[in-house]
Amino acid sequence: MDDKISPAGVSGARDTEKQQVENVEYSGYDMTSSPPPPANASLAAVAEAHGIQLPTIDPARRVAVEKSLKRKLDARCSIFILIYIMNYLDRNNLASARLKGLQEDLKLDDTQYATCLSILYVGYILMQVPSNMFINRISRPSLYIAGAMLLWGIISTLSGNAQGFGSMVAIRFLLGFIEAAFLPGALLILSKWYTRRELTKRNALLFCGNLISNAFSALVGAGVLSNMNGVLGHAAWRWLFWIEGAATCTIAIISAFVLPDLPHNTRGFTEEERQVAQLRIIEDVGELDSDANQGPLDGLKMALKDVKIYVMMFTFTAYVVGLSFNAFFVRIALGTSYSASN
């Protein structure tokens, strides 16, 4: 008979009925040295087999601690929205820069300009999966995302120094390569802290960053392009890259101190809050990881065999294709009765 989890231990934890298929780490413990537990073992029994002591806390006290935990966590994770805004600003400012002479100054024909737009996604595709495989193996994902943001901010700034097609293509490829670390990494960090029911709302708020960026990127671009032309002898489109890139670097430095890491090692939380954070996710999953002895390539193989992955790929491809007009929207608007200033 399965062991029961006492009220002083894990309240309401469910008996496991299947083996865990994703690699989730808690409290930095290593389960690779122990054999996988039987599929019908209780959560407490699995924890005991691996030498893990589940935290104990009074139910009434837990409610108060959990409320404080989520309040702090929501405040710190809200910076993800700002990072997502800058992520989209830095990849889409090429369309705004085209208004003030980028294409003419760099002597790009229409095909070369379109190549500069598209090459970003080549780097993005190449790096997304390896980046998330890597971030899942490190203990300080906040520094990884902040470091990636700092790098893409520097690369975006260098776009203002491009002198021709070759340099712009190289910069745009590197920009996509580094930017690829953000979105899947952000979703991974959120999944380490929030339960499945809570994730729905947080993921929706995260994607608001995309919408906000689309709403205000043209206004930001218009402000810079209208007032910075000729300042210090440089074209306005160069200032657009320099200003937005500098803003990205500033936010990256701030995010290194604000973003959370993992429940067991994040600064700014009490020990009690960290214990509750770990306990919440263990209870939500309903079981401990029995596949921790598998490497990242095993997880990749499992994902490639999952038909739901391909359904999501098709859906997201249709979504991105539908939004691709953003890269040419400014030019389309100029084909109407609107002027560049409008």
Predicted regions and their residues:
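Extracytoplasmic
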Residues: 75-110, 126-127, 131, 217-221, ...
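Extracytoplasmic gate region of multi-pass secondary transporters
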Residues: 95-96, 295-342
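Short hydrophobic/small-residue motifs within alpha-helical transmembrane segments
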Residues: 84, 121-125, 211-213
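Hydrophobic core of transmembrane alpha-helices in multi-pass small-molecule transporters
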Residues: 155-156, 167-181, 189
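Cytosolic juxtamembrane N-terminal segment immediately preceding the first transmembrane helix
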Residues: 2-94, 104, 301
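Central mid-sequence intracellular linker of multi-pass
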Residues: 2, 196-210, 219, 225, ...
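Short hydrophobic/alpha-helical segments at membrane-entry points of transmembrane helices
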Residues: 144-145, 164-172, 184, 235-236, ...
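Conserved MFS/SLC helix-loop-helix module at the cytosolic interface between two early adjacent transmembrane helices
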Residues: 125-168
